[in-house]
């Protein structure tokens, strides 16, 4: 199809690159209109480079401003030209990890009024009119309050945008709503590759205890972004306060090695599945036979 429009909603700067960077770069390179909405500036993030430690929330509290620049550079690396902050930059603040005091700030995204935040996203949806929306599952992928809230806001906006009685602008019904996902088999394959490369990672048992990762059979869609993983790695390097990169590996502030995945997985939450496409090879992160998964987020949309 022509005139493809993809909307992604992520919680903080860097989430877009880690979870869907290869997919974003692929569709941007193919000429699709890719819109990224980021819900906060990531003010509560930890800072990796020692020389930038003063930016942290418990010191100068200027990390959010710095990460605006990092995100702009990452979007440039991915080829994405349409980026917005939900409600404008700084409207809602990073809530921090679940259970910390920053969850309770009045302007924390975790405290945002659902319909108000969703209303801001509806404005974007009705302007851009995307056929596809990508965000997190109801657990926020790994339980971060801002990721959970991004899911809630996205789902509510998905409903409200199609309602002619809500707000201003022409209603728009998004055809397909996806969650980002990481298949368990991919996590175990990555762990083995990291051990062979003598890179610190988790034990097999610890992987199964992580709050993310899904059964392979739950994955509905597999996007092969191998041709664009270089752009994903460049975007990761742009998020220098949050990510250290030694291709093909990267690490967050916990210094646990992970692979920059070139094949990214998604779960179709709402919409009609399109026809299955060719799967990526197992050795590069594909899920293998049976090849009954979509290979295109826009599959089946006419």
Swiss-Prot record:
Keywords: Hydrolase, Metal-binding, Zinc. It is an enzyme of class 3 (hydrolase). It holds the Pfam family PIG-L. One of its GO terms (molecular function) is zinc ion binding. It comes from the Bacteria. One of its GO terms (biological process) is mycothiol biosynthetic process. It catalyses: 1D-myo-inositol 2-acetamido-2-deoxy-alpha-D-glucopyranoside + H2O = 1D-myo-inositol 2-amino-2-deoxy-alpha-D-glucopyranoside + acetate. Belongs to the MshB deacetylase family. This is 1D-myo-inositol 2-acetamido-2-deoxy-alpha-D-glucopyranoside deacetylase.
């Amino acid at each position: 199809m022509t005139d493809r429009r993809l909307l992604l909603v992520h919680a903080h700067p860097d989430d877009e690159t880690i979870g869907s960077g290869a997919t974003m770069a692929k569709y941007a390179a193919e000429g699709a209109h890719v819109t990224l909405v980021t819900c906060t500036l990531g003010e509560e993030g930890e800072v990796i480079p020692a020389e930038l430690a003063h930016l942290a929330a418990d010191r100068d509290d200027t990390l959010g401003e710095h990460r605006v620049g990092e995100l702009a550079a990452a979007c440039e690396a991915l080829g994405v030209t349409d980026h917005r902050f939900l409600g404008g930059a700084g409207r809602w603040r990073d809530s921090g990890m679940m259970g910390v005091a920053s969850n309770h700030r009045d302007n924390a995204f975790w405290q945002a009024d659902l319909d108000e935040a969703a209303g801001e996203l509806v404005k974007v949806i009705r302007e851009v009119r995307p056929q596809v929306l990508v965000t997190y599952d109801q657990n926020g992928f790994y339980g971060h309050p801002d990721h959970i809230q991004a899911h809630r806001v996205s789902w509510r906006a998905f409903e409200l945008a199609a309602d002619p009685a809500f707000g201003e602008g022409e209603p728009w019904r998004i055809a397909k709503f996806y969650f980002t996902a990481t298949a368990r088999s991919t996590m175990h394959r990555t762990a083995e590759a990291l051990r062979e490369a003598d890179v610190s990672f988790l034990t097999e048992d610890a992987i199964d205890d992580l709050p993310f990762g899904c059964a392979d059979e739950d994955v509905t869609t597999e996007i092969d972004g191998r041709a664009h993983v270089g752009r994903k790695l460049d975007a990761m390097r742009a998020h220098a306060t949050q990510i250290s990169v030694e291709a093909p590996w990267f690490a967050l502030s916990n210094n646990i090695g992970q692979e920059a995945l070139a094949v990214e997985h998604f779960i179709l939450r709402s919409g009609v599945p399109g026809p299955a496409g060719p799967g990526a090879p197992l050795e590069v992160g594909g899920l293998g036979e049976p090849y009954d998964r979509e290979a295109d987020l826009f599959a089946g949309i006419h």
